[in-house]
Amino acid sequence: SDKDHRFDVQTSDGITVSAYGTEFNVQAYAEEPDIKATLAEGHIQIDQINQSASQELIPGEQAVYSRHTQQMQVRKANLLVETAWKDGKLVFRRTPMEEIAKQLSRHFNVNIQLQGKEIFDYTYSATFTTETLAEILSLLEKTAPIRCEIIEPQQQNDLAFTRKKVIIRKR
C-alpha cells in the first residue's frame, strides 16, 4: 500500500487492520488464542467490530488481541522474530518448545506431537535459513535431552496419504 491508498486485512473475528504505506504482519491462526498485528514501518490502524475506538501502531509495536477476553494490548515487538518469515527465516529467541513445534508444523506442513511434560520446559534461541526439517530436529536434539522421530506419510485405504508426523520426546 502507499500513504494515500489504504490496504485492509480483515480477520474472521471482526478485526480490521488498515495499512498506509507500510510493512506489517498479521497472525490470525484459527487454533491460536491471540491475533497479532506487528508494524515494522509506516502506519497501521486496527479496528474491532462493534468498537468505536481504533488502535494505531507506530513502527516497532505489536497489538495483541485476545479472543478469550476480547481485549487488545499494545507492546514492543521483536521485529527480527516477527518478520523473519518473509525472508524465509525461522527465528527463535528464548522460544518455548511448544511454540517452536507450532512454527515448524506450519513451515514444513507436518504434524508435530510433543510427548512428556518436561519437553514443554525447554526454550531455544536459534535462527534457521536454509535448513531442512531433519537438520533442525537434529540440532534441537544436540542441545537438549530429546529424541525426534519422523514418521513418513502413509497411504490409507482411500488412497489418500497421511501428513508427515514428528514425535518429540525426552531421551
Ranges and model annotations:
Residues Q70-R171:
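N-terminal export/assembly leaders
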Residues S1-Q70:
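Short, small/hydrophobic-biased targeting/export segments
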